């Protein structure tokens, strides 16, 4: 089983079409990885599906970096 971090990074690579080595924990989806607002919405939806969780809109707005996504999933896994 892959770690949460590995799974989150895999989703980011697939959703944003970036190279795996570009996906650093500190990377911002918009500034560093070139995502636009639609990309970030699709990314949140993919994370919800992968981890069978719901990310409320107010929380989704705070998920702007790779680490923020990892932290949210870690904090909200059953």
Swiss-Prot record:
PTM sites of type O-(pantetheine 4'-phosphoryl)serine: 37
Q: Which Pfam families match?
A: PP-binding
Q: Which UniProt keywords apply?
A: Cytoplasm, Fatty acid biosynthesis, Fatty acid metabolism, Lipid biosynthesis, Lipid metabolism, Phosphopantetheine, Phosphoprotein
What Gene Ontology cellular-component terms does the record carry? cytosol; membrane
What are the protein's GO molecular function terms? acyl binding; acyl carrier activity
Look up keyword Iron-sulfur and say if it applies: no
Start and end of every Carrier domain?
Answer: 2-77
Q: How is it modified after translation?
A: 4'-phosphopantetheine is transferred from CoA to a specific serine of apo-ACP by AcpS. This modification is essential for activity because fatty acids are bound in thioester linkage to the sulfhydryl of the prosthetic group.
Q: In which pathway does it act?
A: Lipid metabolism; fatty acid biosynthesis
A GO biological process of this protein is: lipid A biosynthetic process
Give the UniProt subcellular location, in the record's own words.
Cytoplasm
What is this protein for, i.e. what is its function? Answer: Carrier of the growing fatty acid chain in fatty acid biosynthesis.
Q: Which NCBIfam families match?
A: acyl_carrier, PRK00982.1-2, PRK00982.1-3, PRK00982.1-4, PRK00982.1-5
Family assignment? Belongs to the acyl carrier protein (ACP) family.
Q: What is this protein called?
A: Acyl carrier protein
This chain's source organism reads Yersinia pestis
């Amino acid at each position: 089983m892959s770690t949460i971090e590995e799974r989150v990074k895999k989703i980011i690579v697939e959703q944003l079409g970036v190279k795996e080595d570009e996906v650093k924990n500190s990377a911002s989806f918009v500034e560093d990885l070139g995502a636009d607002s639609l990309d970030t919405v699709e990314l949140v939806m993919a994370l919800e599906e992968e981890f069978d969780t719901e990310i409320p809109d107010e929380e989704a707005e705070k998920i702007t970096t790779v680490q923020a996504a990892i932290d949210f999933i870690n904090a909200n896994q059953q």
